[in-house]
């Protein structure tokens, strides 16, 4: 890619992703296997106190990954989050939002 186009592409991609990132609701959740999840309004998402890598699918669906744990967050039409997890060894389930 031309040197001048690379920064422009990065800025465009960031600008497009920012509105979706902003719709993450504030929540705390507890999952089996002693997994604690916290999200600030607009992000980021923390798994057991560590900031997770966030993947945005759309304005209502996200995945946060840290240390072999993936947290899936879907935002319901009323704004409440539905949180589930997948961990090493195929462990998975629904998390309790507090």
Task: Name the predicted role of every residue range.
Residues 1-22:
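Classic N-terminal secretory signal peptides
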Residues 22-98:
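Cysteine-centric segments in proteins
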């Amino acid at each position: 890619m031309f040197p001048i186009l690379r920064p422009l592409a990065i800025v465009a991609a960031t600008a497009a992703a920012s509105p979706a990132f902003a719709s993450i609701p504030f929540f705390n959740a507890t999952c089996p296997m002693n997994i604690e999840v916290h999200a600030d309004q607009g992000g980021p998402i923390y798994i057991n106190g560590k900031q997770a890598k966030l993947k945005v699918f759309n304005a209502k669906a996200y995945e946060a990954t840290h240390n072999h744990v993936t947290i899936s967050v879907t935002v319901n039409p009323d704004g409440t989050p539905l949180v589930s997890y997948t961990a090493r060894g195929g462990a998975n389930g629904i998390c309790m939002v507090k």
